[in-house]
């Protein structure tokens, strides 16, 4: 077991069980005695033992859905998934629980909060200053992913608010389609291209993606459907969405961005303010699977934990 090769300590415990009346899927629960949240560990073991499900055909995804049946309209991920043994070992040492499911190359890490998407194992393969820069860049890009297009739409609806040094962001060409419809159509079109790329044979994925991007981008602007500025900002948002490791968090940001766009279009400044408040409340009132704040250490505030989350510190040693 690759985790055992990194943590050769008797306190590193692995408990095996099964779930699924038909599949009898093997499940391993890994944790570190003395560091794990005992209440959470007890809850997880009880839920797995009492789980009544026909089969876990989708492996850890099926198990995650059974362990935490949150409301369908809540897109925020409660688990992290990783295929890296170093990430799993580090998470165990931090007091987290690792769940391994048979036939799956990845592990489940819990509990998980919004700030876990900011951290990546690669940060610790660089010097502290570089790791801190990458972490802060990841956070900044994630915020831009959420607010860039709604804020730009707000400024386009109120051009008198644009300072002289930002006049270049205004649309130079004539608009044939309202901006809000351009942005919403592109939101769905990008997902359509992504789905097409997934289902395209691997040897054709790269050339077809390049051709589709160039042809659709060029002729959609020339035909008057979209303005070049709209294409630019949506292209940035699409690429920036991959700056954080969690695929589920990327879609959560996308859903909040669409809500912000619609509210800003309908109610102008008050829509933007209300949408921002709604997004903040949606994150702030979320709970992890352990029942703690989803945005800890901001709420409740802890300066020492904030420093650990935002800055890549040196490895403690003597």
What are these regions (language model features)?
Residues 1-179, 289-317:
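Cytosolic regulatory modules rich in charged/polar residues
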Residues 8, 49, 194, 221, ...:
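Short polybasic/polar patches that bind polyanions
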Residues 97, 225, 269:
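Short glycine/serine/threonine/alanine-rich loop segments
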Residues 106, 112-260:
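Transmembrane alpha-helical segments that form the functional core of multipass membrane systems
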Residues 228-230, 234-318:
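Hydrophobic alpha-helical transmembrane segments of membrane transport and translocation systems
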């Amino acid at each position: 077991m690759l985790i055992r090769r990194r943590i050769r300590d008797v306190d590193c415990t692995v408990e095996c069980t099964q779930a699924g009346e038909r599949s009898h899927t093997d499940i391993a629960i890994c944790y570190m005695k003395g560091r794990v949240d005992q209440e959470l560990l007890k809850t997880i073991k009880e839920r797995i033992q009492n789980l009544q499900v026909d089969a876990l055909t989708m492996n850890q995804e099926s198990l995650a859905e059974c362990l935490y049946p949150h409301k369908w309209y809540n897109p925020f991920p409660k688990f992290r998934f990783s295929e890296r043994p170093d990430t799993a070992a580090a998470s165990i040492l931090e007091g987290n629980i690792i769940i391994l499911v048979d036939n799956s190359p990845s592990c489940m890490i819990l509990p998980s909060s919004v700030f876990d998407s900011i951290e990546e194992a690669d940060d610790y393969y660089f010097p502290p200053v570089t790791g801190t820069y990458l972490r802060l860049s990841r956070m900044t890009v994630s915020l831009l992913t959420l607010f860039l297009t709604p804020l730009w739409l707000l400024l386009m609806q109120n051009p008198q608010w644009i300072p002289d040094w930002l006049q270049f962001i205004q649309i130079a060409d004539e608009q044939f389609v309202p901006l809000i419809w351009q942005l919403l159509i592109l939101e769905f079109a990008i997902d359509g291209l992504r789905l097409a790329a997934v289902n395209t044979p691997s040897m054709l994925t790269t050339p077809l993606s390049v051709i589709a991007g160039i042809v659709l981008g060029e002729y959609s602007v020339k035909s008057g459907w979209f303005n070049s500025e709209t294409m630019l900002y949506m292209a940035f948002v699409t690429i920036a969405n991959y700056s954080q490791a969690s695929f589920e968090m990327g879609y959560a940001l996308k859903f909040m961005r669409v809500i912000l766009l619609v509210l800003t279009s309908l109610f102008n400044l008050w829509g933007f303010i209300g949408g921002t408040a709604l997004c903040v409340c949606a994150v702030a009132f979320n709970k992890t699977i352990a029942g703690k704040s989803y945005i800890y250490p901001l709420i409740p505030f802890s300066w020492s934990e904030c420093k650990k989350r935002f800055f890549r510190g040196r490895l403690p040693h003597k």
